[in-house]
Amino acid sequence: MKMSRLVAFSSSLLLGAVLALTGAATANAASSVQAVDYVALGDSYSSGVGSGSYDSASGDCKRSTKAYPNLWANANSPASFAFTACSGARTDDVTAGQLSPLNSSTDLVSISIGGNDAGFADVMTTCVLQSESTCLSRIATARSYVDTTLPGKLNSVYTAIRSRAPAARVVVLGYPRFYKLGGSCIAGLSETERSAINSASDYLNAATAKRAADHGFTFSDVAGRFTGHEICSGSAWLHSVNWLSIGESYHPTAAGQSGGYLPAFSSAA
C-alpha cells in the first residue's frame, strides 16, 4: 500500500513537472510570436481584393479584414502590425509608397508582387475578350517581360526591403494557377488558353522564387494549396470573370485567403 502511494505521489509530481514545462514552453512560444513586428506589403493578392470586407480607410487599396495578413495578425497578436499592401501595386509602387513602416526592429515581412508588372490583368482581359491566337501572343509578351525586365524590378524592391529591415524574415508569396484543366467549365476560354495561363503563372512564380532566394528571402508557393480549388474545379477559391465587379476577377475569395494564402504564409513565417 505504501509503495503504491509512493508511486502515485511520484507520478503526480512527474506529471505536474511535465505540465509546468509544457505550459512554460507554450508561454515562451506565445511571447516570441507576440514580440514580432510584422509588415505586410504587396499587391491585391496581399491586400485581399476578392475577399470582401474592405477597410473603408484603405480606399482604392482595398485592404480586406479577410486578407491573410489580417488573419495572421489576429491569430498571432504581433507586437506591431502595419498593412500597406495595395490593389494594383507594381514593384515601383511598393518602393515608393509602402516601405515607410519598415525599420531595424521589423521582424517579419510578407509580400506578393510582380503580377501587375508583368501585365497579368491585361493578359486576362485579352484572353477573355479576344481570339485564342491573340491571347497566346499576349501571354508570350508577358513571359518575355518576366525574362528580361521583371528580375531587375524584383531586385530593386527586395534590396530596398532588406536595406530598411536588415534583420527581418521576408516571406515572398507566389500566385495560384487559375484553372483546373478538364474541369467543370463548359464555356469561356479554350483548354489551350487555360493551360497557357497556368503555365505563365508557374513561370512567374519560378522567376520570383529565384530572385527571392538570391536575396535570402523565403518563397512560399501557394499553387499547391489551391489545387482542387481552381476556377472550373467546382469548388473554386478564385473568382472567374465578374462583370459586376471586374476588379475582383481572378482574385482569391475569402476561402482562398484563409485556406490558401494564410497557411502558405504561416508555414514560412
Q: Over which residues does each language-model region extend?
A:
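Secretory targeting and sorting signals
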Residues: 1-30
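Short amphipathic alpha-helices and their capping/turn segments at secondary-structure boundaries
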Residues: 25-39, 93-111, 154-168, 265-269
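Serine-esterase "nucleophile elbow" of acetyl-processing enzymes
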Residues: 30-85
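Structural recognition of the beta-strand scaffold that forms the well-ordered cores
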Residues: 37-42, 46-48, 80-85, 107-112, ...
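Oxyanion-hole/transition-state-stabilizing segment in secreted/luminal serine hydrolases
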Residues: 49, 93-146
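Short, flexible, mixed-charge acidic loops at enzyme active sites
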Residues: 51-54, 121-133, 184-187, 231-241
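A structural motif corresponding to the C-terminal end of an alpha-helix
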Residues: 71-80, 152-169, 203-220
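Catalytic His-Asp segment of secreted/periplasmic serine-dependent ester chemistry enzymes
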Residues: 176-269
